[in-house]
Amino acid sequence: ILVANRGEIAVRLLEEAPSPALTPELRITAYLPSGGPFVR
């Protein structure tokens, strides 16, 4: 589970359209314009 400034939205987007080529950390930054803080 990823938690970020927009955690719930980002995680839902990742679950709906996962990108196997990228790690979860890289994928979540795509949904956070600031590339903001997150924890795994």
Swiss-Prot record:
EC category name: ligase
Amino-acid biosynthesis found in the keyword field: no
Catalytic reaction(s) noted: N(6)-biotinyl-L-lysyl-[protein] + hydrogencarbonate + ATP = N(6)-carboxybiotinyl-L-lysyl-[protein] + ADP + phosphate + H(+)
Co-factor note (free text): Binds 2 magnesium or manganese ions per subunit.
Needed cofactors: Mg(2+); Mn(2+)
Keywords carried by this UniProt record: ATP-binding, Biotin, Fatty acid biosynthesis, Fatty acid metabolism, Ligase, Lipid biosynthesis, Lipid metabolism, Magnesium, Manganese, Nucleotide-binding
GO BP annotations listed: fatty acid biosynthetic process; malonyl-CoA biosynthetic process
Known EC number: 6.3.4.14
Pathway, per record: Lipid metabolism; malonyl-CoA biosynthesis; malonyl-CoA from acetyl-CoA: step 1/1
Residues in Biotin carboxylation domain copies: 1-40
Domain ATP-grasp, residue spans: 13-27
Highest taxon above the source species: Eukaryota
Record GO terms (molecular function): acetyl-CoA carboxylase activity; ATP binding; biotin carboxylase activity
Record note on quaternary structure: Acetyl-CoA carboxylase is a heterohexamer of biotin carboxyl carrier protein, biotin carboxylase and the two subunits of carboxyl transferase in a 2:2 complex.
Record function comment: This protein is a component of the acetyl coenzyme A carboxylase complex; first, biotin carboxylase catalyzes the carboxylation of the carrier protein and then the transcarboxylase transfers the carboxyl group to form malonyl-CoA.
Identification of the protein by name: Biotin carboxylase
Lineage: Eukaryota, Viridiplantae, Streptophyta, Embryophyta, Tracheophyta
